[in-house]
């Protein structure tokens, strides 16, 4: 018998264990969630606009949570981000993953999302088949996911001559959007997300003689580094590594101890080398999928 219900606060320890279990096994890895600590889970969900219980789901058997799934749908965004589905090993083979996925898609549709984006570990063949059977299409190239512990960071001491790094403000919206669209022409972050990030003080800009050269956004709730981008004329000049290093140092002044993640195209060799030099450790490689609604 299937017992699907909304996610509750009391479910967090069990869901965290499902996340840890999957992350430790390449054939079971998913792009969401990547929680390894209760603090990471609490921080991310606390920042959601809607109650997580409205769009996240668990499967309960005899009082125990044995499956997890759902979506995040944020105001102003056209897509929903898929979480899971994750199923405890002893309960697999009962179509629980399919059920969780179908219910997740229904919640995305009910929230007005135009598509669902999912990511699966490159070796998670079962998860890939599940998505493809539900109509998801493979999207783009594989992404490498990294994590950085503050104690492992190797900062860049000296930046390119004449380049300054500062925290952006609401007045920098146009400049940040111009950098974003130039560096990420296929990016899906809406303007409202950039406006909110600038207002929250999580966006950093690199400039020279008043001209924007690079941008990066470090989200303290997701503990994630988004959109490290450098304009084409300044690439391979050390600007990207410098803005990232300065942004990280400033971030950790206010959030000491936070372990941060990021993802980058697995074939972007210059970026991979940059992250390795600064101490980032590889976590997993994921493939992206999309389901139009």
Give the positions of each predicted feature.
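A short helix-loop-beta-strand connector motif used in the catalytic cores of GNAT acetyltransferases and
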Residues: 43-58, 67, 81, 195-205, ...
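Conserved GNAT acetyl-CoA-binding A-motif
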Residues: 108-121, 251-263
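Conserved GNAT-fold acetyl-CoA-binding loop/helix
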Residues: 23-45, 177-200
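Conserved acetyl-CoA-binding loop-helix of GNAT-fold acetyltransferases
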Residues: 87, 93-106, 133, 230, ...
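A short beta-loop-alpha structural element at the N-terminal edge
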Residues: 3-17, 163-176
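A short, internal acetyl-CoA/4′-phosphopantetheine-binding micro-motif in the GNAT/acyltransferase core
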Residues: 72, 83-92, 120, 228-236, ...
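Conserved beta-strand-loop-alpha-helix junction that forms the acyl-donor binding cleft
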Residues: 92, 118-127, 232, 261-272, ...
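Conserved catalytic-core motifs of GNAT/GCN5-like acyltransferases
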Residues: 119-121, 137-151, 263, 281-293
């Amino acid at each position: 018998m299937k017992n699907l219900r909304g996610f509750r606060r009391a479910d967090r320890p069990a869901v965290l264990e499902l996340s840890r279990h999957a992350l430790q096994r390449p054939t079971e890895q998913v792009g969401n969630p990547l929680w390894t600590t209760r603090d990471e889970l609490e921080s991310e969900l606390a920042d959601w606009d809607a109650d997580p219980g409205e769009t996240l789901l668990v499967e309960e058997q005899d009082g125990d949570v044995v499956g997890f799934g759902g979506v995040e749908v944020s105001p102003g965004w056209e897509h929903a981000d898929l979480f899971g589905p994750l199923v405890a090993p002893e309960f697999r083979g009962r179509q629980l993953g399919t059920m969780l996925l179908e219910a997740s898609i229904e919640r995305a549709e009910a929230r007005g999302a135009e598509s669902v984006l999912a990511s699966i570990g490159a070796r998670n063949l079962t998860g890939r088949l599940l998505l493809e059977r539900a109509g998801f299409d493979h999207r783009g190239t594989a992404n490498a996911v990294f994590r950085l512990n503050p104690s492992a960071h190797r900062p860049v001491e000296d930046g390119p001559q004449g380049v300054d790094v500062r925290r952006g403000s609401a007045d920098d919206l146009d400049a940040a959007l111009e950098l974003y669209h130039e560096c990420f022409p296929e990016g899906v972050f809406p303007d409202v997300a950039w406006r909110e990030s600038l207002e929250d003080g999580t966006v950093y800009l690199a400039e020279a003689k008043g001209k924007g050269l690079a941008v990066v956004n470090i989200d303290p709730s997701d503990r994630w580094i988004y959109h490290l981008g450098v304009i084409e004329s300044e690439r391979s000049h050390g600007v990207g590594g410098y803005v990232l290093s300065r942004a990280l140092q400033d971030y950790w002044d206010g959030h000491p101890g936070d372990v941060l993640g990021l993802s980058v195209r697995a074939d972007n060799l210059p970026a991979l080398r940059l992250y390795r030099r600064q101490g980032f450790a590889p976590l997993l490689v994921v493939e992206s999928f999309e389901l139009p609604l």
